[in-house]
Amino acid sequence: MSAVFDASAFLATCSNRPGVYRMFDAEAKLLYVGKAKSLKKRLASYFRKSGLAPKTAALVARIAQVETTITANETEALLLEQTLIKEWRPPYNILLRDDKSYPFVFLSSEDEYPRLSLHRGAKKRKGRYFGPYPSAGAIRESLNLLQKAFLVRQCEDSYFRNRTRPCLQYQIKRCKGPCVGLVSPEEYAEDVRHSVMFLEGRSNALADELNVGMEQAAMRLDFEKAAELRDQVAILRRVQDQQSMEGGNGDVDIVAAIVTPGGACVHLISVRGGRVLGSKNFFPQVAIEEEVGEVLLAFLGQYYLSHQERDLPAELIVNVTHEDFPVLVSAIAEARGRELEISYRVRGTRARWQQLAVTNAEQALGARLANRQHVAARFEALAEALDLAEPPQRLECFDISHSSGEATVASCVVFGPEGPLKSDYRRYNIEGVTAGDDYAAMHQALTRRFSRLKDGEGKMPDILLVDGGKGQLAMAQEVLQELAVAGLILLGVAKGVTRKPGLETLYLNDASHEFTLPADSPALHLIQQIRDEAHRFAITGHRARRGKARRTSTLEDVPGVGPKRRRDLLKHFGGLQELSRASIDELAKAPGISKKLAEQIYAVLHSE
């Protein structure tokens, strides 16, 4: 592909019809995707001789080819644009980080004593789904509230089925003990019904009903029941006082965008059935100068068009307007089969909602930029400490975690001047090395990481930080030499004799270049932060791997118990601990387990 782009020749043949354009660089890499009412007019604006913002000019300088697709109308253009952005994620587009599917509160319907839980993903199980909520934290807050007020169980079914006495939740008055029959199905069903009323946003009607019940219980001289209902009403009133968005039963999303030279933030508040489900901050990637309206338009398009499973409210309240909002509404209606209203000029309570979202976006962006500056300052201090010409842009740190050689896991964490790059974090399950040999484990992890780098996978770090001192530093040198990786700064970190933070010894590139930094050095604080994050990431991976291995390793010794039976047994009893407590008769009642096999399992589990 030619690196010289003839804009005049291209524009001479460009159509004036609606469509989508794609800009590529000299290596055929997609740089940017856009849509236009008139392709010719929109593309001509990129190639004018003056007036371009610096970042936009940088994009134009890289253009080697432009491809266009004509569409029937603007709505089709917007839908195609969102599809291409989601598929290719071009670096110069405003990009919304790809999130997990939004969580729901799930109420099982097939159980005599239904369970409330957090649910993500496809809605395959029979039951009711409430939400979606903007974050798992918002769901946990609601579940915690429901557990306090109505004591509906949240334990796993396998755990519930195998209880012989009430658990701690019963002792602290967060559950009525349905697992051991301490509450009747009828009374429990009433608690479930009240929970559903709350989740549906009917908290006022629920409070009225509970008040009536409280008065009736008092008249019957059932003061214990009256006190229980009084406490439930008090919890509901506190929730209502905390939620300033009463005054309707509608479904509304309030979305506010803020853009500064340092970045952008979009704050979303979700209201369903007149009840606030929660809020969330988004920080879109903005590669070229964009007006706040453009950022908001891009966010709304990607948020509601690229994720069909997301709940669509009846109304959006926004803090800025854009001429393409009617096109967006049309595209959403076509893609989702439902229309929504976008409101900008609002009054009264709705104006307060709007301002609340703006304030939250401003504060979140301010905090993020302040933290970014803090981390960037530490990167500059590190460059000064290592006598580098400029601050590094990518720093990777490796660590090893195991329990006496069991379930060894290596971690790789990545930091840049903006903070941790968690999407680039990696874990490596170490296999085929002597138990407890940290050097061999590090050799394997580094070999796997940099072999993939040589194959074109991932980015080269500026600095490789290795926790473990001289020995691990030598191992890193060996791997880099074996793979012919050059131009990489090695930094080894060894804890002092007392292992106290601030007394670390550092090694630059080899063991002969040993030095220390003052305990109050920002550069040392950065090294400690990254090392501790690598340790955290390694140990959580190790614990998960060890737990999985320990859950199955004992059962692997039983002839006739394969992987499927092991999973079924653990699921039936709720874990290895409960399985170990089971008698032979209880084991024989599990699906697919004969009396003879139950005796064998019991013998293995109770052997010395």
From Swiss-Prot:
The gene is uvrC. InterPro entries: GIY-YIG_endonuc, GIY-YIG_endonuc_sf, GIY-YIG_UvrC_Cho, Hlx-hairpin-Hlx_DNA-bd_motif, RuvA_2-like, UVR_dom, UVR_dom_sf, UvrABC_protein_C. Belongs to the UvrC family. GO terms for molecular function: DNA binding; excinuclease ABC activity. Residues 16-94 form the GIY-YIG domain. Its main location: cytoplasm. HAMAP family: UvrC (MF_00203). Residues 204-239 form the UVR domain. One of its GO terms (cellular component) is cytoplasm. It comes from the Bacteria. Interacts with UvrB in an incision complex. Disulfide bonds: none annotated. The UvrABC repair system catalyzes the recognition and processing of DNA lesions. UvrC both incises the 5' and 3' sides of the lesion. The N-terminal half is responsible for the 3' incision and the C-terminal half is responsible for the 5' incision. Keywords: Cytoplasm, DNA damage, DNA excision, DNA repair, Excision nuclease, SOS response. This is UvrABC system protein C. It comes from Pseudomonas aeruginosa (strain ATCC 15692 / DSM 22644 / CIP 104116 / JCM 14847 / LMG 12228 / 1C / PRS 101 / PAO1). It is found in: Cytoplasm. GO terms for biological process: DNA damage response; nucleotide-excision repair; SOS response.
